[in-house]
A protein has these predicted regions:
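Terminal helices and disordered tails flanking the catalytic cores of nucleotide-processing hydrolases
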Residues: 1-93, 236-298
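Alpha-helix termini
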Residues: 28, 35, 136, 152-155, ...
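Hydrophobic transmembrane alpha-helix bundles
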Residues: 30, 85-90, 106-114, 127-135, ...
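Acidic/His-rich, divalent-metal-binding segments that scaffold phosphate/diphosphate chemistry
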Residues: 37, 44-166, 173, 178, ...
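Alpha-helical scaffolding flanking metal-ion-dependent phosphate/phosphodiester catalytic sites
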Residues: 111, 134, 138-145, 157, ...
Length: 298
């Protein structure tokens, strides 16, 4: 299980002290935070924010222009996001991320959009696209509280530094619970679990039972992280190399194969149905020459 203590003082977007340095983030602490602050944040439709324009830019850039080539579906994705409401404090978190950590902000937007697209294409009545939009848009806001020197480190992380990285799902959970003024938020719980894996090898809880919303988020999260520039590697993964990793992870039972096949379908020009996907059996592209992800200094 990943560490649950936070080495720095943690504040919300309004400057309220939530957690003291080296205090454990637990359900008890979250209960205390909610009881103390009793946040009453009004909601706003995302159609009234700049998030919409920024998502449109993301789905029309790079590989995502190909993945959202079906204009009808792309318009549905945008429409769902426009009709989704968030607390104004969450929107402020996103606005702050856009200024201070634009890469994380853009990552959050495209993960939300891809996850919604999968929901639309699966056409499963049990999926609420607006619910997954909300989860996608908060799944990494906790990274805004991580030390920038750790986030932008180009050399291998120490075990302690990686432990700090692993706290961000807990910070996601704390912030969302705080802003929604409840410890029983499905959205906050989903944000907590976005680094879990179906074989129990993920973090921070190390659980194997993961709800379908989170299972949808996971391959989208991994894919964009791989094809994006990161300080700890020499260049991004190619689309093919990134998809190969998703396939390998699904074969190991770590992530949902159905959702991985959706991602493969989106990247192909002929857009086959996800049930007809037959992934390549061999790695087709080389990985970055320098990649310190998963490498520890001590």
């Amino acid at each position: 299980m990943a560490r649950t203590t936070w080495p720095q003082i943690l504040y919300d977007i309004e400057g309220n002290l939530l957690v003291s340095a080296d205090q454990e983030i637990s359900k008890k602490v979250i209960d205390e935070v909610i009881e103390k602050h009793q946040i009453q944040s009004s909601k706003i439709l995302l159609s009234q924010t700049k998030v919409i324009n920024d998502i449109q830019k993301r789905i029309n850039s790079g590989i995502y222009k190909e993945m959202f080539a079906n204009k009808e579906t792309a318009e549905k994705v945008i429409d769902i996001i426009m009709q989704t409401s968030c607390t104004k404090l969450v929107v402020r978190e996103l606005e702050t991320l856009k200024i201070n950590m634009p890469d994380t902000y853009n990552h959050i937007l495209i993960v939300a959009a891809l996850s919604i697209k999968i929901c639309i294409d699966l056409d499963n009545p049990e999926f609420d696209p607006q619910q997954i939009a909300k989860i996608g848009l908060v799944h990494d806001i906790g990274k805004s509280r991580l030390p920038i020197e750790v986030i932008e480190k180009k050399s291998p992380l120490t075990h302690n530094e990686f432990g700090i990285i692993q706290t961000h799902p807990w910070i996601d959970h704390l912030l969302v619970s705080h802003y929604l003024n409840t410890t029983k938020s499905f959205i906050a719980q989903a944000a907590l679990c976005h680094h879990e894996r179906l074989d129990g090898s993920g973090y921070p809880l190390g659980i194997a039972k993961i709800n379908n919303y989170v299972q949808t988020i996971i391959p989208c999260d991994i894919f964009d992280a791989l094809i994006s520039q990161r300080p700890y590697r020499s260049e991004p993964f190619t689309v093919r190399a990134a998809l190969d990793i998703l396939v390998a992870e699904s074969k190991k039972g770590k992530i949902n194969t159905k959702f991985v096949n959706c991602m493969i379908s989106y990247a192909r020009k002929d857009k086959p149905h996800y049930e007809d996907i037959k992934p390549s059996q061999t790695n087709r592209d080389a990985t970055p020459k320098i990649n310190y992800y998963g490498v520890r200094k001590d």
